[in-house]
């Protein structure tokens, strides 16, 4: 899902920003659905996706109702612009050639998604102004996704330790290489 907004002044909530589009927001609605504008930053995998789930990035207050939107849009919906960029950890600086699209076969990628009056039909809108539920979604996402990243180094230690133990049990340290 597309969660990370550019944010602007981080000491202020969405409704307090000088530019209201620094957080994705509802700009209009009609009998068919809602229209959203804003942006989502650091979106890995979005260029390879068929659908994008838009959701808030921070806890919201009652003043932020227009920014309390969760919905699904096709990745090629009208009004979406992708500003493609490379990830800081890719290896292009070490590779030969003049191609500048990352590792053409397996490279990582990241994009800024700019939303300009992107339409979301009502059947794909999951939160519409209910700021209380948007905040709960952010918290759940944090619990399941963001916190799992903190554990990756610890998991690496466990895997390395297990591999070293298996090597010891199999006598690898005593074998000529």
Describe each PLM feature range.
Residues 146-177:
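Alpha-helical interface subdomain recognition
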């Amino acid at each position: 899902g597309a969660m990370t907004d550019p944010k602007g002044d981080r000491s202020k909530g969405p409704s307090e920003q000088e530019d209201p589009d620094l957080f994705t927001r509802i700009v209009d609605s009609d009998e068919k659905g809602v229209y959203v504008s804003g942006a989502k930053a650091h979106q890995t995998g979005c260029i390879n996706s068929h659908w994008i789930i838009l959701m808030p990035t921070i806890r919201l207050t009652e003043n932020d109702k227009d920014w309390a939107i969760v919905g699904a849009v096709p990745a090629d919906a009208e009004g979406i612009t992708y500003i493609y960029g490379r990830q800081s950890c890719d290896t292009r600086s070490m590779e030969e050639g003049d191609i500048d699209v990352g590792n053409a076969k397996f490279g990582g990628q990241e994009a800024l998604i700019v939303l300009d009056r992107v339409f979301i039909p009502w059947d794909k809108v999951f939160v519409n102004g209910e700021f209380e539920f948007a905040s709960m979604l952010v918290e759940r996402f944090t619990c399941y996704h963001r916190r799992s990243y903190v554990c990756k180094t610890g998991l690496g230690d466990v895997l390395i330790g297990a591999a070293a133990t298996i090597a010891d049990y199999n006598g690898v340290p005593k074998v000529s290489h």
